[in-house]
Amino acid sequence: HCADLHLDSPMETHMTEEQASTRNTEIIHSFLRLTEYAAKNDVRAVILAGDMFDGERVKVRTIDEILDAVRRTPNVDYLYLAGNHDDTTYAFADHDIPTNLKLFSKEWATYEYDGVVISGIEICEANAHSLYLNIPHKNGVINIVTLHGQVGSSSDVDEINLSLLKNKGINYLALGHIHTYSEQPLDSEGIYCYSGCLEGRGFDECGPKGFVLLTVESGHLEHEFVPFSCRQLHRIPVDISSLTKNSEISQKMKAAAQGIPSEDMVEFLLSGGVDPTANLAVSYLQNLVKSDFFFVKVK
């Protein structure tokens, strides 16, 4: 279960063109690595819970890479549910869709595997209320439902009415839209889970990113978050009260970031009262530490 790749989306505005290009390529390659992981570990199906793309920004070569990776792993099904940022009509125009790429639509669709059924629907204005009236369910198997949106208490295009999904026999509700992994009880039978994104893109997406591995054995479902990103993003608060020199501040920044791998991305958040005579220079501080990590931002 993964979601929210946002392929070819704009990167952090303060990145260099080269850094932004590198990150876009890495995000695409994270999905390619995911397909290899799935094939190697005998994963039967990958749930893509929305926002794989980012509107019409997606490049033809990106679509080609994604579809080629799907074709290279024919024993894995990819169950793709479009999200609010997706435009599948545009993305897949003039492309042959591999048989193992299964697309959900604005009507409920269900895919059956050994002891598991996976159902999903793309929420729109026409079905935002009615979709809760006929949620698919099959007795004697694990029932997984996938949706894209923000959980809440209303039924809307952008909001999933959690109360109307309770006590419907759902064992696992696979969600997309929130870019951080989280899980909560749905009812006595199941949980709802946001897988988060595969790779963080901005400093509002810090921490481990990856996917959720679901294992079903003897009618029992287990789930595990698998960190998978090639880089992490970090926000590091640094109290610079009483410091008067840029060199002192940079040393405190380095100490605060100790232990963070050099390939990661770091945003330093400076706080505290500074003497007006200190001649604090944010751009200079950024230059002092930028070689320590893939990307550095100082605020």
Tell me what each language-model feature is.
Residues 1-65:
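N-terminal active-site segment of His-dependent metallophosphoesterases
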Residues 18, 45, 54-193, 197-210, ...:
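His/Asp/Glu-rich metal-coordinating catalytic cores
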Residues 28, 32-39, 64-67, 132-134, ...:
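Amphipathic, non-transmembrane alpha-helical secondary structure
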Residues 218-299:
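Accessory, non-catalytic peripheral segments of nucleic-acid enzymes
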Residues 38-42, 138-140, 259-261:
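Glycine-rich phosphate-binding loop signature in dinucleotide/nucleotide-binding domains
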Residues 49, 176, 269-271:
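Conserved residues at the C-terminal ends of beta-strands
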Residues 53, 86, 272-276:
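Short, internal active-site loops enriched in acidic
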Residues 1-19, 209, 215-238:
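Domain-start "cap" segments at the beginnings of catalytic or binding domains
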